[in-house]
Regions:
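Generic structural signal for alpha-helix termini and adjacent loop/cap motifs
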Residues: 17, 64, 91-95
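Hydrophobic alpha-helical
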Residues: 1-60
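Hinge/cleft segment of the Venus flytrap/periplasmic-binding protein
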Residues: 87-144
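Structural signal for conserved beta-strand scaffold positions within catalytic alpha/beta enzyme cores
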Residues: 50, 73-74, 133
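Short, well-ordered alpha-helices that flank and scaffold nucleotide-derived cofactor binding pockets
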Residues: 37, 41, 63, 86, ...
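Rossmann-fold dehydrogenase core element
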Residues: 64-74
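Hydrophobic alpha-helical segments within soluble ligand-binding/sensing domains
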Residues: 6-8, 53-59, 75-104
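Active-site nucleophile and cofactor-binding loops and adjacent substrate-binding regions
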Residues: 25-28, 73-78
Length: 144
């Protein structure tokens, strides 16, 4: 489990150790929210990006000095769910076996290929994450 307090502590330590720090890239939704709060509360000029939930990050996203996060990313959960469903159906219907190199169509999401994962298994990768910024955050903050 990822704890917000650890991310808060690490962000505070980074700011203390590196007072001229320009940017933090947070790889988790918990980490980016905790770091954003620390940066904003401290009036830091350090910027932040990474993976975040629009509902938790909308107040920190902006393209001015008052906001710590100019943009962040996350995969659209609807697309993640749809790809998971199409993958499961392809497995059940024996269109794929789950072996690296298997290919299938995931409806309007397009064509996908099963690839080797770093842990020795296989995986299906959705693709690039969605970018949230000051221009679109309001339409997403109530979605997830």
């Amino acid at each position: 489990m990822i704890e917000p307090q650890k991310s808060t502590d690490v962000t505070q330590a980074l700011l203390q150790t590196y007072p001229d720090l320009k940017v933090i890239c947070a790889p988790t939704t918990v980490g980016i929210a905790a770091a954003a709060k620390v940066l904003q509360d401290n009036g830091s000029s350090c910027k932040l990006t990474g993976l975040g939930l629009p509902s938790e990050m909308s107040e920190y996203i902006g393209d001015d000095d008052a906001h710590s996060c100019p943009y962040m990313f996350l995969w659209n959960p609807e697309d993640v769910g749809r790809l998971g469903a199409y993958t499961s159906i392809a497995l059940v219907n024996e269109e794929i076996t789950g072996a690296a190199g298997d290919k299938f169509t995931a409806g309007d999401l397009g064509e996908y290929e099963v690839t080797e994962a770093s842990d020795g298994g296989t995986e299906v990768i959705l693709g690039s994450p969605f970018k949230f910024d000051p221009f679109n955050i309001d339409e997403w903050k109530d979605v997830y």
